[in-house]
Amino acid sequence: MLRCREVYNICKGAMSNEVKHYDYLVIGGGSGGVASSRRAASYGAKTVLIEGKALGGTCVNVGCVPKKVMWYASDLAHRLLHARDYGLLQEVDISKEKLHFNWKEFAGKRNAYVERLNGIYERNLAKEGVEYVHGWARFNSEGQVEVTRPDQTTEKYTADHILIATGGEPVLPEGIPGAEYGVDSDGFFRLEEQPKKVVISGSGYIATEFAGVFNGLGTETHIVIRKDHVLTKFDPSIQEIVTEHYEKEGVNIHKKESIQRVEKDPNTGKLTVHLSGKIIEDVDQLVWAIGRKSLLGIAPENVGVKLGETGHVVVDEYQNTSTKGIYALGDVVGNMELTPVAIAAGRKLANRLFGPEQMRAQKQDYDNVPSVVFSHPEAGSIGLTEPQAIERYGKENIKIYQTKFTAMYYAMLEDKSPTKYKLICAGPEEKVVGLHIVGDGSAEILQGFGVAIKMGATKADFDSCVAIHPTSAEEIVTLK
């Protein structure tokens, strides 16, 4: 006689041969995929979302959310050092050397917060009527989506519309002996202990943010960059201010350098990092933050989805891939790797596919998208950089307004942090085509100005706004 469990397994195995059909099938449970699936289901579309890891994607699990929590801790460490200058904690000997950060305890709290968000994502899917399948999806040779569950059973799916929203993953260097002794940017969030000495390879926003976090929490921080500045994709004003201030704050920036090889002491576990012209010894942790690539283990070639030279899925302005009925958005297309962009694109795609007639032509606008870097201090950018504006309009047709100052908060402090705002205007009407800001609160400040720039504001519009005093942001509407 068969036991109940054996009968269940036989039935389950048989069921896995069935092909389930949906109106909308989403591969990837990150921000873009979840947003698109929920919007589609709200219109009554029979929707299924497939995800093999934790819901929330890079942003929730190994990106924006846990990174910002770490940034808060590092920022607070900076603020605590300012307490005495503001008449507080006079009886306490506070110094950077004496501040102790409990990495392990805080990481546990951070991870618990992330797990709560995972649960919220799952409940929100259920609330909208989206079927959630935990498993790994790939296209089979018949054009179906085949899902392998954690117990290794498989299921097959088809759909009228399929969205690829699988996100990206960190790039690791090739051809560098000992590179495996380091961790990628995802691995940062798996560190169980705070390293006393860290080397970070990379100059982008991830490397820059990690460097700020480590340094603020008391780790001896080294960052290896190929050029003279960090954040080389941002406006030169941001590059210069952040690089200079990091050096002032004690971050060791190794410019025009690259890692050649890495050695590990078998007894101590310490690393020796060999650069082109110098050696960094007694390193506790090496972090590779040199870029990201599309996560595409879904066999897109089986359904004819075209990939670009960099491995990203090629899409048109409506998120259509080269295969009819299959779409892609988010990090996997490599356009703007920002969570809010993926969310907006996902919702607009669902509106176009399943929404009312007036939404059938919707598409995501990728112009004037604000972005920020949670460095120390923060930096924010929207629109064209100065070199981009010159290239588009000609140097004679743009005008730059900028100011550099010390925010009022630092008037009581010996330790100063810079603030710089730069407004780029084009044409005789002086339309604002770029805004680049560095300083405390830049992330919050930029959101409101982003609305104005998106609406086509001119310098005169900015000037017509009465300033809020005393604030740093008032400088943006009083630039001369």
UniProtKB/Swiss-Prot annotation:
Annotated positions binding NADP(+): 206, 209, 226, 291, 337, 372
Cofactors (names): FAD
Pfam families referenced in this protein's UniProt entry, alphabetically: Pyr_redox_2 (PF07992), Pyr_redox_dim (PF02852)
GO cellular component: cytosol; mitochondrion; nucleus; peroxisome
GO molecular function terms listed in the Swiss-Prot or TrEMBL record: flavin adenine dinucleotide binding; glutathione-disulfide reductase (NADPH) activity; NADP binding
GO biological process, one term: cellular response to oxidative stress
Principal cellular location given in the protein's record: cytoplasm
Active site per UniProt: 469
Cofactor binding summary note: Binds 1 FAD per subunit.
Note from the entry: The active site is a redox-active disulfide bond.
Self-association state and partner proteins as the record states: Homodimer.
Assigned protein family: Belongs to the class-I pyridine nucleotide-disulfide oxidoreductase family.
Functional note: Catalyzes the reduction of glutathione disulfide (GSSG) to reduced glutathione (GSH). Constitutes the major mechanism to maintain a high GSH:GSSG ratio in the cytosol.
Name used for this protein in its record: Glutathione reductase
Species for this entry: Eremothecium gossypii (strain ATCC 10895 / CBS 109.51 / FGSC 9923 / NRRL Y-1056) (Yeast)
